[in-house]
Amino acid sequence: MIKASKCNKPRALFLVRVSIPRTFIRNATSAVPTTIKLNDLASLPPITKSLPTNLPFLMPDTLQSLLRFDSEKEKQPSTDKSNDKDKPSRKEKGKDKEKENEEKKDINMDEKYEINEETDTKPTIDPNNPVSSKSNISSSSGGDNNNNNNNNNNNNDSDGKNDDGSPKDKEFLSPSDSGLHPPFLAIAMKDRPFLPGATRHLHVSDPEVIKCVNHMINSNIKSPYFVLFHVRDTNSEDAALDVIKDRDFVHEVGTLCQIIKTTGSEILVYPHYRVKLVDISTPNSRSESIEKEQDNSQTSYLKKFEVSYAVTQQLKDEPYDEQSITINAWTRRIKELYEKLAPKYDQPENKEEIMSNPSMLADFIASKVHAKPEQIQEILESSNVETKLELSLQLLQVEADADEMRQTALKNIRERTEKAYAQSLIKEYTKELLKAAGIGENSKVHKFDERIKHLKMPEEAMKAYKTEKERLGTQSDMEQNVVERYLDWLTQIPFGVYTKDSFNVKKAREILDRDHYGLKDVKDRILEFISVGKISGNVDGKILCLAGPPGTGKTSIAKSIAEALNRKYTRIAVGGVQDVHDVKGHRRTYVASIPGRIVTALTQAKTSNPLMLIDEIDKLDTTSHGGAARAFLEILDPEQNNSFVDNFIEVKVDLSKVLFVCTANYLGSIPGPLRDRMEIIEVNGYTKNDKIEITKRHLIPAAAKKVGLDEGRVVIPDETISRLIDKYCRESGLRHIKSLINRIFSKASRKIVEELEETDVDSHNKDTVEGTLVAKESEKVISDKAKIDTENSPIEYIQSNTEVKAETTTESQQEQEKEKEKDEEIKKLDLPADLKIEVKPETLKDFVGPEIYIKDRLYETLNPGVATGLAYNTSGDGDALYIESILTDSISSDLGNAGLHVTGSLKDVMKESASIAYSFAKQFMVRQFPDNRFFEAAHIHVHCPGGAIPKDGPSAGIAFTSSLVSLALNKSLPNDTAMTGEITLTGKVLAIGGLREKSLGAKRAGYTKIIFPKDCEYQLDEIPDEVKEGLTYIPVEWYSEVFEHLFQGISKEEGNSVWKEEFAKLEDKKKSKKTNTK
């Protein structure tokens, strides 16, 4: 009778209980070695069921023969008396002895049956869960493999060796307690580590490793296994090697892999489970213990190759609670995320088994997601199932987030594409409806037609308009947009639209005087220009250029001219423009092309005769072959600009009616051909008196209005303004002084607010004290009343008190919100009528900081060799320029290095002036004082203080000469005299520029006499009387005249004897040298 029952444990074998005669049992058990137990089978798993069935598997029948053991006793095949039953000698014994043996065998079989019954109830080996290495093999494969293994062991040859010399399977029995594997081929890998449970492709490049793998396959080795370890430093030069150099070269934990198929250097492997590195033998360092055990190992063939092989031990998972809340939560979350990403991955055949095993699930997820090798190695090394799940979940979450972002991006792209497609369909549909209805062009064409009704377009422009208009509706969307944009620009150009000029000189004078103080010469020139226009009836073809320092009001003057002429004002800033297309536009073939700045300015002005200000024309970038400058040659030429063609419009535009006004700081930067086309009007810097008046009339009222103060709240006397100009802003313009005035009003506003707040705080504190006393009295009365009410009815008191508090709270909240809204409303502060702040010269530094210009002069008393020149810069500021000359060595030193050395950041022109002055000074001294041989032995160092400031210009010649002559005569120059002018080798004094600004600088520094070239006398008429007041101008033509003014009363004897003693010492030295030489 046979009874079968299923075990409760998952994947357990069916237990079969059979009642069989003992004689049958004796005959059946005689063929089975009694020493082999099911729980002693190999820990290495058989081939996994999840592999493809069509692959040529190269694997042994059993894996238990691959383990090594430490116990020699376990290596010996155990015997049993039951095995002797089959021998012929047994049959010759007596019946009594035979019965006795049969009874013993029955007892042994009963014991074996009990042992087998216990082992049969254990879980079988899971092919996809190699961690449970000590479990039984499955009923479908384990029993067959066991029988086959026994048969193989019984049929081994007598020599016990394979053809290649490796031991037969019979030499490898059950593992010892240590559970160490025999030496396996060890391979290092740089890429992502392999996790158990999934087939992978491995690429090897080392020839010895390839030979070894091929030998394992071709020789039918029953152990096609190797261990795979990940390299620690993947950035090292040896990271790509397959052979392990030493133990520290790889991580301690790797995977045991089975070779399934090889194709050249590619190996298809199946990682079974984790292993830990115990010992390793490398080609550079062989391990004695491994080499000794290799002689009795089935993998001894590895010694034939220059490869690394290692002894490893299976790394099992730590026990865990299947009911753990954390594990179950993470497992559930992983399953949820995996289901979302499942279409991306290949689904395994044993998916249900993987999903039910947390450890297998962690490995499976980690093998699928994108991650760095270090992250995968961390999961591989972890034996804690909970940790593995956490790490795998983190990687899967990142994968899910990235996939969600990708899906969102694709969705947005799809929606935009569908929307654009729908709009395109609607647009085409609308066009067809309009065309079928005979309505004609869309509303844009109607808008263009309405525009040209108010224009007097020339024939060429009208022809271009009609041609492009006909193209509408017949082009693609891209061409359609280009045509519409062209028509839009073309119909905005004000063809034939003009404003009527006003030539009222009186009105123009009023406007100029209203907006500007001073600048008499500039105003006169502008009024003359308007008067000529009134007589001729037009101001066509005029190009003005206002040249002057920054901040002198050139731009505002242009606005005033436009207002005086009743013309529209438009401005073009060309500073830094280098591309001609910025001026003349791009052709329509370019994407997003537009007209140039000239046509754009016309469309903004909406008239064909505006005043067009071309600002900063001296800062045109001329480095790119002068492209933009060449474009302005056509625009500013009255003979050519009546047919200006923009590259975008491609139609002639008349610019002859435009009044061009250019501004520049330095005329020398404007190309010569362009400068010749302009009528130059110089806008000189303001004098000190001009600055004071402009500050009082314009700057102070504007600053007061800006901060919201009435005029008179902040009082700035003339003395304060004068000190502000002298000590803070000496430039010719007004920008810096304007910023300082604004700063004064900002500081004054702050002082006013702080003073008012202090007053409010004092009054608030007083009100608070009185309010506190009243509140305390009220609280006392309320508490007494409440006490009486509570004694009468506590419940009614509580209820009524609660209602009162609620009503009070609601009312107080509403009041607070209203007050908050009132506070948020910005209101102008009411100031007391008597509140004023006066800025005195003594308190000026409290508003604008410490003084910038402390001293007006560098030298109060000039030393011999120091001369005072005058300089002028492009910002319109004039100042004293000191020139110092000294002897570097005494004349009697006899060094023989006479010459000149110049410093002070001088440019080429000033260096030439110094060299010319040195040559002329030597000639002049020889002619005037022949016995003064100063320049024959003197090495002179000439320096201009302020080396950080570059200096250049042809106006310091006489100052250099005077400095050298002063040093040669050892006589100081007058303290009250400054000079300017260039000199030639013959002593001629040449003309210079900027005498007005230099006069301002000399007067500010305290000089009362100015020596200047006689050829510049005409400039005196341009200098205001207030500047010339207190100054004496000395015109000179030759340097001899300069010498007479600077060195009055010096005789020839005095000049010849200046260095007489030094030269006597020099002669004595020369004589002594000759004597010593003889």
UniProtKB/Swiss-Prot annotation:
Residues forming the catalytic site: 955, 998
Major localization listed first in the record, in broad terms: mitochondrion
Compartments (UniProt record): Mitochondrion matrix
Organism: Candida albicans (strain SC5314 / ATCC MYA-2876) (Yeast)
Protein name as it appears in the record: Lon protease homolog, mitochondrial
Gene that encodes the chain: PIM1
Transit peptide: 1-27
One GO-annotated biological process of the protein: cellular response to oxidative stress
Binding partners and assembly: Homohexamer or homoheptamer. Organized in a ring with a central cavity.
N-terminal signal peptide: none
